[in-house]
A protein has these predicted regions:
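Short beta-strand immediately N-terminal to the catalytic nucleophile in serine-hydrolase-like folds
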Residues: 65-67, 92
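Conserved serine/cysteine hydrolase catalytic core
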Residues: 133-148
Length: 148
């Protein structure tokens, strides 16, 4: 059984290191780095989710998913699409319906931030902006019943 911890936007897989150390689950804990999953593809939500799904689907046994913010959205989407492949689901600060006004405001703030602020976060500034834009229409409200 694998435990997959998924970081949020503006974070890296290292964000989970202390948590995993405290839980002492390093033998079966995985922390994919989201920017690495999309490689050279355009950073849209659909591309990121497809890459995340491929990552999770490489494991035959049901997985435990724990996601923070963007990581939670990806984990939720995966649990809806593959409910039999998810043994447990922990969502932290995760929206099942994207707050459009908040995302638009966030993108506005991102536009004024220098590119250098984004370098340590894994994605380029343009990637942040595009990813947030492509998430605005996400709404899992009608699919939540698929998770038991």
């Amino acid at each position: 059984m694998k435990q997959i911890y998924v970081h949020g936007l503006g974070q890296t897989s290292d964000s989970w290191t202390k948590t995993i150390d405290i839980l002492q689950t390093t033998d079966y804990s995985l922390c994919p780095n989201l920017p690495d999953l999309v490689h050279s593809k355009e950073v849209t939500y659909d591309n990121l989710y497809a890459a995340f799904s491929d990552y999770c689907n490489q494991y035959d046994e049901p997985i435990d998913l724990c996601g923070l913010s963007l990581g939670g959205v990806l984990a939720l989407n995966y649990a809806i699409q593959y409910p039999k492949k998810v043994r447990s689901l922990v969502l932290i600060a995760t929206q099942y319906k994207m707050p459009k006004k908040l995302l638009k405001f966030q993108n506005l703030l991102f536009r004024f931030m220098p590119k250098s602020m984004f370098q340590q976060m894994g994605f380029r500034k343009a990637d942040f902006l595009l990813l947030c834009e492509t998430m605005m229409e996400l709404d899992f409200n009608n699919s939540l019943h698929k998770i038991s």
